[in-house]
């Protein structure tokens, strides 16, 4: 029973989070470190806890996450997506609440590539009329 878990994969920009939910006491470990150490900003910690707070499961699960790629905000949102999917696998009746909050939707926005002949993705070089 100790090694039974529910799995969820979350993604955001270029970050990918592989999430495992175990029955436990509310401990969250990200890449082998407590999530308070891995994400020191309170806003990122809040983002990670959102699906647990919404479904009133904060103290019910231990969560282990492997996350790679992207920056800290993208990683935090990927973890939130992964936790939401793992919760859904465990309790399908939570779909409505998680869907309304937008935690099950993969945010598909990515950085637009730079085009040749331009300074950036959309910014042009300065035009001189004369």
Swiss-Prot record:
SUPFAM superfamilies: Ribosomal protein S5 domain 2-like (SSF54211). Residues 109-130 are annotated as: Disordered. InterPro entries: Ribosomal_Su5_D2-typ_SF (IPR020568), Ribosomal_uS9 (IPR000754), Ribosomal_uS9_bac/plastid (IPR023035), Ribosomal_uS9_CS (IPR020574), Ribsml_uS5_D2-typ_fold_subgr (IPR014721). Pfam families: Ribosomal_S9. GO terms for biological process: translation. It comes from the Bacteria. The keyword Ribonucleoprotein applies. The keyword Ribonucleoprotein applies. Keywords: Ribonucleoprotein, Ribosomal protein. Gene3D superfamilies: 3.30.230.10. Disulfide bonds: none annotated. GO terms for molecular function: RNA binding; structural constituent of ribosome. GO terms for cellular component: cytosolic small ribosomal subunit. PROSITE patterns: RIBOSOMAL_S9. NCBIfam families: PRK00132.1. Belongs to the universal ribosomal protein uS9 family. This is Small ribosomal subunit protein uS9. It comes from Nitratidesulfovibrio vulgaris (strain DSM 19637 / Miyazaki F). The lineage of its organism: Bacteria, Pseudomonadati, Thermodesulfobacteriota, Desulfovibrionia, Desulfovibrionales.
């Amino acid at each position: 029973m100790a090694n039974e878990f529910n799995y969820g994969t979350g993604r955001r920009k270029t970050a990918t989070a592989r999430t495992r939910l175990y029955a436990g006491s509310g401990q969250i470990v990200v890449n082998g470190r407590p999530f308070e150490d891995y994400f020191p900003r309170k806003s990122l910690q809040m983002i990670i806890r959102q699906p647990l707070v919404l479904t009133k499961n904060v103290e019910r699960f231990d969560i282990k996450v492997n996350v790679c790629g992207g920056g800290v905000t993208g990683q935090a949102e990927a973890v939130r997506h992964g936790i939401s999917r793992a919760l859904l696998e465990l309790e399908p009746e939570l779909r409505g609440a998680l869907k309304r909050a937008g935690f099950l939707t993969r945010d598909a926005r990515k950085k637009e590539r730079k085009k040749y002949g331009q300074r950036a993705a959309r910014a042009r070089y300065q035009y001189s009329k004369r």
